[in-house]
């Protein structure tokens, strides 16, 4: 055998699980086995005519106090967290996008102690901005995806260095969005997002609003590594979420050198 390439340990269960279709330098391979203890996956060359898409369950727990800014109906914070991620299986899709089937997997959970930038919004504030309870999950999810894509604007990272999770009912009982560093102990990316929240989330809002699609696309709110298959996503709701947060930031403590308007 020969070494083809490498993937991050934390992403291995989602990208090189048994049965996964793995692309490397234009060639297609299928994964035969994954040994997490030895950190090695065995593959064979094959083009099966379908793609695979891992399904994951992610949980997050705040493990320390961190730093918070209370903006009334919105709170912003940067906190230590413990992220637990479990790959439960994968979808097989034809090249035209048709779902063939779902294959269950039994893989151990992956644990990541790291740092996250987070914000919460009261349900009342969301309702006042046109987001009823049924739309909260998709609105937060879409805002989270877009924010992950724009964090490299203020932090020296790329999309693969960070992860996220949105919750209609977060650890504090409120709708919550987390964006976390994908490195054990954190790498400073989330902290930069917290310090420059107005710039970061403002650019995120602009990017979504400028995209001409109606319901969301890979250029705005869809994510190529979403463990939930980009469902649910509510693009108009994401715009309302970000406007709500930015309006609170505008009258609260400026976090990135900007004066309140």
What is the meaning of each model-derived region?
Residues 214-225:
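Local cysteine-cluster metal-coordination motifs and their immediate loop/turn environment
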Residues 250-252:
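Alpha-helical transmembrane segments and their immediate juxtamembrane flanks
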Residues 1-211, 230-245, 255-257, 261:
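Extended Lys/Arg-rich polyanion-binding regions
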């Amino acid at each position: 055998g020969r070494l083809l390439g490498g993937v991050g340990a934390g992403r291995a269960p989602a990208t090189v699980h048994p049965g996964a279709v793995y692309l490397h330098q234009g060639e297609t391979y299928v994964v035969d086995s994954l040994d997490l203890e030895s950190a090695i996956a065995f593959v064979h060359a094959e083009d099966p005519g379908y793609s695979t898409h891992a399904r994951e369950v992610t949980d997050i727990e705040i493990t320390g106090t961190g730093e918070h800014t209370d903006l009334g109906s919105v709170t912003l914070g940067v906190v230590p967290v413990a992220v637990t991620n479990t790959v439960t299986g994968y979808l097989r899709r034809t090249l035209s996008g048709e779902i063939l089937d779902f294959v269950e997997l039994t893989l151990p959970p992956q644990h990541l102690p790291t740092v996250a930038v987070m914000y919460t919004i009261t349900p009342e504030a969301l309702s006042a901005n046109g987001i009823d309870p049924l739309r909260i999950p998709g609105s937060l999810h879409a805002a989270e995806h877009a924010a992950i894509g724009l964090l490299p604007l203020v932090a020296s990272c790329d999309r693969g260095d960070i992860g996220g999770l949105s919750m209609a009912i977060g650890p504090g009982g409120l709708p919550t969005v987390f964006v976390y560093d994908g490195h054990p102990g954190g790498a400073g990316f989330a902290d930069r997002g917290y310090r420059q929240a107005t710039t970061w989330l403002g650019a995120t809002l602009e990017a979504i609003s400028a995209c001409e699609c109606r319901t969301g696309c890979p250029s705005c709110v869809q994510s190529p590594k979403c463990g939930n298959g980009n469902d649910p996503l509510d693009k108009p709701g994401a715009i309302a979420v970000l406007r709500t947060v930015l309006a609170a930031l505008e009258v609260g403590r400026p976090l990135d050198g900007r004066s309140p308007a």
